[in-house]
Amino acid sequence: MDIERPAAYVRNRALKTGSSMSRSIPIPLRTRLLVGGSLALAIANAFAVDATPPSVGAWQFLRPHFYGDRELGEVDESFMHVEAPGSTPDPAATPVALHFGKEAVGKIKQVRVVIDNNPSPVVATLDIGAGQPIAEIDFRVRVDRATAVRAIAETTDGKLEMRSAWVRAEGGCSSPPNASGEGKIGDVRFRPSEDGTSLQVSVRHPNYSGFQIDPKTGDAIPPHYVSHMQLTTGGKPLLDIESGISISENPTFRIVSAQPIATPVTLEASDSKDAHFSATWNGAADRAVAANGTR
């Protein structure tokens, strides 16, 4: 797992910006906050990676909501495992990596990431393009307190498999925002590997959680976050991401593929204020990005 913090962003054209958002929390987010906020359950002080967590926190409510009574398997790490630090020095930017083994590559169609004890426990839903040989997905999250971080994968044959990791943290969802997230919203950076098998995509955005305080006014900062990112490669779906406030500011996703990632790669993104952003990367040799958001 090696997510680099974006040092600079590419100026990108905002395609569409909606009207000012009401200070109220959108209904889907409000539902998630109520699920997480109603819980006052403690987690034992055990932080082994890929352990089976107890049925505590939001998971006991989320499991039947998303999966009903479907059987949920506990695969070993040769199929999938979750990598996260047992104790994070920065709870507002905790690295998480989802690793998929050879048996899983090309056979997982969706992964839902859940942080049990976050106020918004559903971190992201990741839909992998059909046939895409994705072997790893890395990103950074906010962690509000000691919790299980879960990845629930649905395979192409309809099976559900889960792995998890323990993380000790405190206050990630209310940590003060950094100035780096308050620049030109929607600026995009692509960072490819030399061999073309991995690509990091970053969007400049504050991703306000709704639990942060404006240091100048003392008022709560309303939630404002990237809600959807769609990546296509060579005109085919690569990864579709639905996300919320548990993703760290300046949302960054790194994709590792078992094969070189075809170009061009296009990102279409939108946020909770209905702003839309688009940018395209045309290949490793093409390093510069024009002001219109096309690489």
Regions found by a protein language model. Name each.
Residues 22-35:
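Bacterial N-terminal signal peptides that target proteins for export
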Residues 49-182, 187-196, 200-266, 270-294:
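A general "mature secreted/periplasmic domain" signal
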